[in-house]
Structure formats: structure tokens, C-alpha cells
Amino acid sequence: CVHPQFRSGKALSMLWLNLVPKVLWSMRAKYVMGCVSIHLEDNLARAYYTHRQIQQLADHQIIDIRSNRAFEPERPEYSFPQDERMPKLFDTYLGMQSKLSKQAFYDEDFKCLDYFVFLEINKIATSFVMNKMVQR
């Protein structure tokens, strides 16, 4: 988990630019897995539309990991255009060629939906790290 104050594209870039070459390659890691979350509290419309978009992802963007506490967000009574956009962190992970689970795990403690994320180190290196290093 990353503290909300540091959840930005710049912070994520710094994490991956340092984590991949310095830690993961030295460990000879092949894969990284974790989760990406969307808060439900005062955010039901965004959670609903994000969940819908994840259901529409291509097969190469999906990993079949099922949750025993799956959660299906209900369609909101109203929403704003910004609610219909997938959160940037989800887009970033998809841009890194990661795979997401279609099912969301409902985390009662944090009041959020967690989607499983699976990344191949070689894909991170080619699609994200090298691209960011060239941009420096």
C-alpha cells in the first residue's frame, strides 16, 4: 500500500524505475503480483464504471483469478462524466501490460474493491521502465 499523499503518477514512476532494475532484476524475479483498488465510499459511480470497463478488457489483459468474496457494484442512480473514466492507476498498470482479474474482492476494512494484478517483469521493463528512462 502507498500512503494517499504519495499516490501519484510521479511516485509510481519512481517506484517502478527503482524497483525493477535494482530489486527485481537482482532477484531474478519473473513476475510481480498484487492488487489495485478503488474506494467505494462516496465513489460508487466510479467503482461501477471501472468494474464495467474491466469486464470489457481483451483476453490478453485478463487473468482468471476468482474471489470468494466477489462484489458486483450496482448501477448508480446518477453519475458525472468523470465517474465514467477508469482511474489513472488502473490505466497505468494496463499500460505496463499487466493483467487484471475481472472479479473484485470486497475489502471491508478499507471499504474498497481490490482487483488482482499480475505483471511479467520483462514486460514491465520493455513497456514502462525503458520508456521512462528514455524520457529522462
Identify the function of each model-found stretch:
Residues 1-98, 108-112:
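Acyl-donor binding region in acyl/amide transferases
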Residues 88-90, 100-135:
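C-terminal/domain-terminus segments
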